[in-house]
């Protein structure tokens, strides 16, 4: 009986401990997500390989210009973490509506290739033809309302045969 009571006391002590913090926030502006923002904490998951670099770009202003070349507000390049998801802090000028794009440059060449992955805020479904012809998703599907520090999940997509999408969970 005393072992049962001791075990229950031990379990209650473990339950009272604070939840362990997640992965360290990466990027040159990591401190901006430790306060009140405004910032996006971009949570990137679904890596094909643990090599290369991530390029995160934020967009604001006119939603029809999201993802246009050269229209980004902030660009951050970081190494792919050895394990787990990547949390990147992206500060924004003020609370409001924004979008994010992420590119996983698998070989670190600085150029987009067929092995590279990508994703966007809102995780819109894109076809391989959308990627080939550089068609942008509807702004309503990718827009994020930032107030303070706002978490933005992004699942990476890769070319797989004749399609473009997230890797199967079993292959991670």
Please report, for each region that a protein language model flagged, where it lies by residue.
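Short proline/glycine- and polar residue-rich coil/turn motifs
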Residues: 78-84, 145-146
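Exposed aromatic-hydrophobic patches
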Residues: 85-92
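Acidic, glycine-anchored loop motifs typical of Ca2+
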Residues: 105-114
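A short tyrosine-centered beta-strand micro-motif
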Residues: 93-102
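Extracellular beta-sheet/turn segments enriched in Thr/Pro/Gly and aliphatic residues
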Residues: 24-32, 40, 125-163
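Beta-strand signatures of extracellular beta-sandwich domains
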Residues: 55-59, 101
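A short, amphipathic beta-strand motif
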Residues: 38-46, 56
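Bacterial N-terminal signal peptides
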Residues: 8-20
């Amino acid at each position: 009986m005393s072992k049962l009571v001791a075990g229950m006391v031990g379990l209650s002590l473990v339950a009272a401990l604070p939840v362990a913090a997640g992965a360290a926030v990466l990027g040159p502006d990591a401190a901006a997500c430790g306060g009140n923002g405004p910032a996006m904490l971009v949570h990137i998951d679904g890596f094909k390989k643990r090599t290369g670099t991530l390029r995160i770009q934020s967009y604001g202003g006119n939603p029809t210009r999201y993802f246009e070349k050269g229209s980004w507000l902030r660009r951050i390049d970081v190494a792919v973490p050895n394990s787990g998801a990547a949390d990147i802090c992206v500060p924004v000028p003020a609370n409001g509506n924004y979008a994010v794009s992420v590119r996983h440059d698998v070989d670190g060449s600085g150029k987009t290739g067929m092995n590279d992955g990508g994703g966007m805020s809102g995780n819109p479904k894109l076809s391989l033809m959308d990627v080939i012809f550089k068609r942008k998703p509807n702004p309503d599907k990718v827009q994020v309302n930032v107030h303070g520090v706002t978490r933005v999940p992004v699942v990476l997509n890769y070319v797989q045969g004749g399609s473009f999408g997230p890797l199967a969970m079993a292959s991670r």
